[in-house]
């Protein structure tokens, strides 16, 4: 079971890293617009609605970010995972706490 989560975490991180590298600088899809880390979350391409666990692909990163569901997430990576789980219904709202 642990190996399964390690593989899933690695896959999610690779998807987000790949998206970060392919995005054009200054594109509006970056979450958040300012901060230590910005990601381009592929919520239109990747569906994780079947996944009901909480995963932090960026452990140790504290960069509060508010989602459109008015929940504060510890960092953009966690928000992206929640966005993938919701099929894109939860997205970036603003930087900082809600």
From Swiss-Prot:
| Disulfide-bond pairs as recorded | 41-80, 58-77, 66-98
Glycoprotein as UniProt keyword: yes
Instruction: Give the UniProt keywords, A-Z.
Output: Disulfide bond, Glycoprotein, Hydrolase, Protease inhibitor, Secreted, Serine protease inhibitor, Signal
Claim: Signal is one of the keywords in the record:
yes
The primary location reported for this protein is secreted
Can you tell which superkingdom this protein's organism belongs to?
Eukaryota
Q: Where in the cell is it found?
A: Secreted
Q: Where is this site: Reactive bond?
A: 60-61
Function of the molecule: May be a serine protease inhibitor.
User: Which PANTHER family does the annotation name?
Assistant: SERINE PROTEASE INHIBITOR KAZAL-TYPE 14, SERINE PROTEASE INHIBITOR KAZAL-TYPE 7 SPINK7
- The name of this protein is Serine protease inhibitor Kazal-type 14
Write down the species.
Rattus norvegicus
């Amino acid at each position: 079971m642990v190996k399964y989560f390690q593989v899933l975490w690695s896959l999610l991180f690779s998807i987000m890293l790949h998206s970060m590298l392919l995005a054009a600088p200054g594109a509006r899809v970056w979450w958040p617009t300012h901060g230590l880390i910005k990601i381009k979350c592929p919520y239109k391409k990747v569906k994780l609605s079947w996944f009901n666990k909480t995963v932090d692909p960026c452990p140790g990163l504290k960069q509060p970010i508010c989602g459109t569901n008015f929940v504060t997430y510890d960092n953009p990576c966690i928000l992206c995972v929640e966005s993938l789980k919701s099929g894109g219904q939860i997205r970036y709202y603003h930087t900082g706490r809600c």
